Swiss-Prot record:
With S4 and S5 plays an important role in translational accuracy. The keyword RNA-binding applies. This is Small ribosomal subunit protein uS12. Residues 101-138 are annotated as: Disordered. Keywords: Methylation, Ribonucleoprotein, Ribosomal protein, RNA-binding, rRNA-binding, tRNA-binding. PANTHER family: 30S RIBOSOMAL PROTEIN S12 FAMILY MEMBER. The modification 3-methylthioaspartic acid is found at residue 89. Residues 105-114 have a biased composition (Polar residues). Part of the 30S ribosomal subunit. Contacts proteins S8 and S17. May interact with IF1 in the 30S initiation complex. CDD domains: Ribosomal_S12 (cd03368). Residues 125-138 have a biased composition (Low complexity). NCBIfam families: rpsL_bact (TIGR00981). The gene is rpsL. It comes from Heliobacterium modesticaldum (strain ATCC 51547 / Ice1). GO terms for cellular component: small ribosomal subunit.
Amino acid sequence: MPTISQLIRKGREVLTEKSTAPALKECPQKRGVCTRVYTTTPKKPNSALRKVARVRLTNGVEVTAYIPGIGHNLQEHSVVLVRGGRVKDLPGVRYHIVRGALDTAGTQNRNQGRSKYGTKRPKKGAATAAKGPVKGKK
């Protein structure tokens, strides 16, 4: 505990908050080009093949970004939009690719949480036809 005279001489040091997505340089999103698209395995209790991409951002920084949703159309040289947000079971993956923006297509056949996966609102007639026949009616 400092004395009053020590506080007068030095003052309190203000704690600076460390950014969770430093490569974005305080921007909400950044554009980038995929340099490599591949799958990787998660940390210990989990088991899967997670889809990730190595992206070179417009500021020259190269980051690893997660591709959310089922299926994607990304390949090398695809232009993508990158936002912050880490993937807990993938070490070193601190960014997400935004679905439905630039070269990234939205996820198909999605009815809930569509805004997170860039899926357009289904047509009125198409939604019931896609579900199949209604049980109980002949």
